[in-house]
Curated annotation (Swiss-Prot):
Domain comment as written in the entry: Switch 1, switch 2 and the interswitch regions are characteristic of Rab GTPases and mediate the interactions with Rab downstream effectors. The switch regions undergo conformational changes upon nucleotide binding which drives interaction with specific sets of effector proteins, with most effectors only binding to GTP-bound Rab.
Topological type in the membrane: Peripheral membrane protein
Protein species of origin: Danio rerio (Zebrafish)
Localization in the cell: Membrane; Cytoplasm; Early endosome membrane; Recycling endosome membrane
Keyword field: Cytoplasm, Endosome, GTP-binding, Hydrolase, Lipoprotein, Magnesium, Membrane, Metal-binding, Methylation, Nucleotide-binding, Prenylation, Protein transport, Transport
Gene Ontology BP annotations: protein transport; Rab protein signal transduction; regulation of endocytosis; vasculature development; vesicle-mediated transport
Function statement: The small GTPases Rab are key regulators of intracellular membrane trafficking, from the formation of transport vesicles to their fusion with membranes. Rabs cycle between an inactive GDP-bound form and an active GTP-bound form that is able to recruit to membranes different sets of downstream effectors directly responsible for vesicle formation, movement, tethering and fusion. RAB4A is involved in protein transport. Also plays a role in vesicular traffic. Mediates VEGFR2 endosomal trafficking to enhance VEGFR2 signaling.
Cofactor: Mg(2+)
Pfam family, one: Ras
Motif extent (Switch 2): 65-74
Binding site for Mg(2+): 22, 40, 63
Protein name: Ras-related protein Rab-4A
Lineage: Eukaryota, Metazoa, Chordata, Craniata, Vertebrata
Amino acid sequence: MSETYDFLFKFLVIGNAGTGKSCLLHQFIEKRFKDDSNHTIGVEFGSKIISVVNKFVKLQIWDTAGQERFRSVTRSYYRGAAGALLVYDITSRETYNALTNWLTDARMLASQNIVIILCGNKKDLDADREVTFLEASRFAQENELMFLETSALTGENVEEAFVQCARKILNKIESGELDPERMGSGIQYGDAALRQLRSPRRAQAESIQECGC
């Protein structure tokens, strides 16, 4: 059975190893916690269709390895990404301090208008927190990022992170800031959207033929 959707967006999940990136992806796709998760080697992939602002959007999500030895491999997957979850662990100052490097890579290597949401993961471990909500919120504001704290364990704000990112991309499409037909935008029209685009064009062509212009 073929899938019907209006748009396809390429997403990345980036950040240091051990921040729970694979668990976030698994919680989003499967609606359950992946308790046997190991560090990603290279890149993992998942996809899901979501409803956003009366549109069906298929997200193709690339979960990249956080270890430095895989960076040269994973950077090749940045090209043409429309959105990204930039993930740190609220219980690890080290993962937070690395955010600037990940952000630089994303903005240099992905599409020029990539939409990024900062995710402070492991919100369920608040008692072990090393990074405050306020300082992460300030970092997000200074770098023009959206921001949520998430828990891959409980599912809190996991779907919301992907939906918020997709919604902002849709808003940019509607405003003309993003063009799905531009090479490397990380966005493609789905069958449903293409049918809507072709219908007015077909009607216009038929009108021209009828008037003999």
